[in-house]
Swiss-Prot record:
Protein name as annotated: Heavy metal tolerance factor 1
GO terms classed as biological process: cadmium ion transmembrane transport; cellular detoxification of cadmium ion; detoxification of cadmium ion; detoxification of copper ion; heme transport; response to cadmium ion; transmembrane transport
Organism from which the protein derives: Caenorhabditis elegans
Regions of this protein lying in the Cytoplasmic compartment: 46-75, 123-129, 189-226, 286-341, 391-461, 511-801
Family the entry assigns: Belongs to the ABC transporter superfamily. ABCB family. Heavy Metal importer (TC 3.A.1.210) subfamily.
Gene name of the record: hmt-1
Binding site for ATP: G583, S584, S585, G586, S587, G588, K589, S590
């Protein structure tokens, strides 16, 4: 008694040759082994069994992996479906088949295997990768499900009582393949040291939700109709793909009886081929679809680029100071094009290809028999698994190549922008070598991507070749020996498979392009997800009818935590008054100007305009009331007219000219060959420093703001021009509130209030006479500048003003 009947049944069946019963013995052994392994692993606490990759993860990665991804949810659902299928199979088997101990052991072990697998998977769902025990368990499960294929003729005999077994087998094979794909392919490569971020498919649902508004043209009904019609053309294309091989079979079979040959079949096949073209290219349907899709693609690009550009302008000055412009533009360019690539390839290549595969499997199962369906299904499953697995592994090289490409672009951009500096120090060779080293570093990573691509192509061709040979041999066998198929069926099979494999040959390339696009899009999302530091509050109101008062109360600001640049500053400015900020470099003068303009948010304290905190005003309305001339004036690479009019884009030419006259640059402009149409060059490099600042002053005058902020606005001017512009600025600020940052104290002697800053605090305050009387820091600075100016005047033989 005991195990004797079971052992007797196993001895009777034997392990060779492999057959349905032998499969049960092997499966029972494999299932039992992994039941023990999974049970032991299931009893191990999480803290002791977490792999090194998981321990090395950052907090951000850990929080991201704690969420259930789509692949994990699908894996759990599929494993649960396998459990349900096993229960149904258990009931079916003991209802239609005679009871044996071996059959009972097989069914029970399989059921417990999948139940423990589900428990193990649920326990380790927060890991970035599949636990090794589950990886081997699911791999073994997939292998033992392939054992019956070695004796397919006996096992799948259509007339035998195994018809029900065949149905359950096909369902379970499909489910196990899905489980293997989602648990092994999407997680196994993390064991090689890749973080969970390495997969471009991570956070796929979040990416889709973010991009969806730019894909569906919500603003245009006509574009929506174009999308619907393009989808309709895709459906027509799938029907044609099924019809053409069938027509080929009919034509070949009709040729066996030439007297009754129907030429209409030939004409119909030719017409359908004209509509279909060469796979995904060249056909009439694809030409029409491409024509219809162009405006949709342009809509997506336009909406996404505009939104991203708008977002970049909404980010704080702190963000822009910490980024390289060339790198940002490169990410923006690749990211926007990647969205169109993803949309085109998924909608017009991936979805149709998968649909064709599903239709082909169903067609061969129904029109031929299960053998043909399994050949197509097995080849497709193996091809897709290998393609996706190796491509996922290649993602790390693609991402690394992108980073090095960004770095190369940033080096080139910075070097060309600073062309003049490079020439000053004779560092052309140094810059060329730096650029060369960046390219060489990029090409090392590029070689890895190309070499791994060649390896993948080799495997893909091998899989497709094996599938074609196996299918063709089987068709010939059915024609020659079984006499159940005709020559037309051979033509149908080969035509259909060649038609199916043609787009599949490009599937690997398409998948790689899509994955690279996801990586590019991921970098773009990093930009789009950067938090806007300075933004309008929900209840912010427009700043209208300004009275011109500013109140700074206990203001503190720090760029880096714990290192304040401005420390507890307080002062008030009345309407029409001018406050001057003086002090040594790095004392916080320019930072205070930026805080008043709300380029940064204060760390502590408040800034009030007309008694209301600036955070209660909308930024646009507040900044419209402020005119600022920065210390380092940067102009657009456009005309002088454009740069001055930038202060108020709706200003007329006459108003622009009046502003230029007020800034004392009109005569200089008119002396140029092209006058106001003169191009100023990149960053305004064609103009001198003084000319650039006068252009900046002109556009500030044109803006007609209530508040004037001057950040050493006359520092680059010669003495006569400085005196003339100073009078102009004094006149401009007479009825307006002004804040002036000055290095030359002679330019602020008439200020209503002078604040002497040092290391972010106010050392002294008062007007010019009061500060001189204090005999403090300001008086020392004044005496030093007077002595310096007197020495220069004596040297040049000029009279001291």
């Amino acid at each position: 008694m005991g195990f004797s009947p079971f052992l007797d049944e196993c001895r009777a069946e034997g392990l060779w040759p492999i057959g349905p019963s032998c499969n049960k013995i092997i499966s029972f052994g494999v299932y039992t082994f992994f039941i023990v392994v999974n049970f032991i692993v299931l009893c191990i606490p999480n803290s002791n069994s977490a792999n090194n990759n998981y321990r090395r993860m950052t907090d951000d990665d850990a929080s991201s992996t704690s969420k259930l991804t789509i692949s994990k949810i699908l894996s759990i659902c599929t494993i649960f479906a396998v459990i349900c299928q096993s229960i149904f199979y258990f009931c079916f088997t003991f209802y239609f088949h005679p009871y044996t101990h071996l059959l009972l052991a097989f069914c029970v072990s399989k059921l417990f295997f999948w139940i423990l697998s589900l428990c193990s998977f649920s326990k380790w769902r927060n890991q970035p990768s599949t636990p090794i025990s589950l990886a081997f368990a699911f791999s073994a499960a997939l292998l033992i499900h392939c054992i019956p294929l070695t004796d397919w003729k006996k096992y799948f005999e259509p007339t035998s009582k195994n018809r029900g077994d065949l149905t359950f087998y096909i369902i379970e094979l499909a489910l196990v393949t899905v489980v293997f794909f989602f648990t092994i392919v999407t997680g196994l490569f993390n064991f090689s040291g890749c973080s969970s971020r390495e997969s471009a498919w991570n956070n796929l649902s979040k990416k889709v939700v973010t991009v969806a508004p730019y894909i569906w043209p919500t603003k245009s009904i006509s574009l929506q109709l174009r999308v619907v019609f393009c989808l309709f053309l895709l459906i027509i294309g799938r029907l044609i793909n099924v019809s053409l091989p069938i027509l080929s079979k009919w034509i070949v079979d009709e040729l066996a009886t030439p007297d009754t040959f129907q030429y209409s079949l030939l004409f119909l096949a030719t017409f359908l081929k004209f509509l279909q073209g060469n796979g995904a290219m060249g056909g009439f349907l694809n030409t029409v679809r491409t024509y219809l899709w162009i405006p949709i693609q342009q809509y997506t690009t336009r909406e996404l680029e505009v939104e991203l550009f708008k977002h970049l302008h909404s980010l704080s000055l702190r963000w822009h100071l910490s980024r390289k412009t060339g790198q940002v533009l490169r990410v923006m360019d690749r990211g926007t094009s990647s969205v169109n690539n993803i949309l085109n390839y998924i909608l017009f290549n991936v979805v149709p290809t998968i649909a064709d595969i599903v239709i082909a499997v169903i067609f061969f199962f129904s029109a031929f028999n299960a053998y043909f369906g399994l050949i197509v299904f097995g080849t497709m499953a193996l091809y897709l698994t290998v393609t996706i697995s190796i491509t996922e592994w290649r993602t790390q090289y693609i991402r690394e190549a992108n980073e090095k490409d960004n770095a190369t672009s940033a080096i080139a951009t910075d070097s060309l922008i600073n062309y003049e500096t490079v020439k000053y120090y004779g560092n052309e060779e140094f810059e060329v070598n730096r650029f060369k080293n960046a390219i060489e570093s990029y090409q090392v990573t590029e070689w890895k991507t190309q070499a791994s691509l060649a390896f993948l192509n080799c495997l893909q061709n091998a899989i497709i070749g094996i599938g074609m040979i196996g299918g063709s041999v089987f068709v010939v066998y059915m024609i020659v020996h079984e006499k159940t198929l005709t020559v037309g069926d051979y033509v149908l099979f080969t035509t259909y498979l060649l038609q199916l494999y043609t787009p599949l040959n490009f599937f690997g390339t398409i998948y790689r392009v899509i994955q690279k696009a996801f990586v590019d899009m991921e970098n773009m999302f990093d930009l789009m997800n950067d938090e806007v530091e300075v933004k309008d509050l929900p209840h912010a109101l427009p700043y209208t009818d300004p009275r011109g008062t500013i109140s700074v109360k206990n203001l503190t600001f720090e760029y880096n935590t714990g290192l304040p640049v401005i420390k507890n500053i307080s002062f008030e400015i009345g309407n029409g008054q001018t406050v001057a900020l003086v002090g040594s470099s790095g004392s916080g003068k320019s930072t205070l100007i930026r805080l008043l303009f709300r380029l940064f948010e204060s760390t502590e304290g408040s800034i009030e305009f007309d008694g209301i905190d600036v955070r209660n005003y909308t930024m646009h309305s507040l900044r419209q009331q402020i005119g600022i001339v920065p210390q380092d004036t940067v102009l657009f690479n456009d005309t002088i007219m454009y740069n001055i009019r930038f202060g108020r884009p709706d200003a007329s030419d006459e108003e622009v000219i009046e502003a230029a006259k007020a800034a004392m640059i009109h005569e200089k402009i008119t002396s140029l060959p092209e006058g106001y149409a003169t191009m100023v060059g990149e960053r305004g490099l064609k103009l001198s420093g003084g000319e650039k600042q006068r252009v900046a002053i002109a556009r500030t005058i044109l803006k007609k703001p209530q508040f004037i902020f001057l950040d050493e606005a006359t520092s680059a001017l010669d003495t006569p021009t400085e005196r003339a512009i100073q009078k102009c600025l004094e006149k401009l600020c007479k009825s307006r509130t002004g804040v002036v940052v000055a290095h030359r104290l002679s330019t602020v002697v008439n200020a209503d209030l002078i604040l002497v800053l040092d290391k972010g605090i106010i050392l002294e305050r008062g007007n010019h006479k009061e500060l001189l009387a204090q005999q403090g820091t300001y008086a020392s600075m004044w005496e030093a500048q007077i002595a310096e100016q007197r020495a220069k005047s004596i040297e040049l033989g000029e009279e001291l003003p």
